[in-house]
Amino acid sequence: VTRRLLVLLALLAVLVPGTATAAPGIVGGANADQPYPFTVSLHSASGKLFCAGALIAPTWVVTAAHCAFGKTPADISPRTGTNDVAQGGEVAQVAGIVVNPAFNTQNPAGDIALLRLTAPVAAAPIGLATAASPGTATRIVGWGQTCPKLNCGGLPTTLQQLDTKIVEGTRCTAGFDGTAELCTDNPGGKSGACFGDSGGPEIVRDGDHWLLVGVTSRPGNNAPECATAPSIYTSVVAYAPWIAEKTKA
């Protein structure tokens, strides 16, 4: 894993300075066309967005490990049940943080973490997918930067969405682990997750509802700009046993 990759991983979890605006797209995406009550915006104690997550149970949120590593519960303020990053829904409190033991600052493997909330929230959680393979149609959602260069613009207030798909792992060249990660396409060669989207959900349609298949992790290459190649997502399918163990009553 190169030093540049680790720097990019860290940058994905920082707020892009500037006032939030309703700019269209994740990068190349659009405003959410439906409620995604399970999508969680993660804010610092001062209220700034730094990552996202997905509500998988009334008291549990899954996010990226690099969003939670080194933080205390008081450092994270989750807002649930709304497509608006700044209002609506319910602001929860974090009681505990569980970072996957495979993750450390020198290696992006195991980029998944769990946040235990102090009390159940009203928003409906999302179920976990049981399979993921190249060719699977997916959707990514988030409040991250909508232009590809770091600090090139403000963040959207409205949740963004982008339809994409899982592709062959050979298209992700930045330390990709095919046993525990998903390589996800950048449609048109210029759209995908960006700074501020880290930890957010990659979802798959299952009938009339959605299932969580991945967690936004990092770029699939070493480029300093977003969406110039497919992106890497932590596979929720691969970590389902770990999630079940840590969240059991």
Please give the residue ranges for each predicted region.
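C-terminal subregion of chymotrypsin/trypsin-like serine protease catalytic domains
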Residues: 2-5, 40, 54-68, 76-77, ...
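A conserved glycine-rich beta-strand in the N-terminal activation segment of trypsin-fold
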Residues: 39-58, 89, 107
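Chymotrypsin/trypsin-fold serine protease catalytic domain
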Residues: 84, 92, 97, 109-189, ...
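Active-site-proximal beta-strand/loop segments in catalytic clefts of secreted hydrolases
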Residues: 42-45, 55-58, 64-67, 80-83, ...
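Conserved H-D interstitial segment of serine endopeptidase catalytic domains
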Residues: 42-43, 61-64, 69-102, 169
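Cleaved targeting-peptide boundary
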Residues: 22-28
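Secretory targeting and sorting signals
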Residues: 1-22
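Active-site region of chymotrypsin-like
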Residues: 34-49, 120-125, 160-199, 206-225
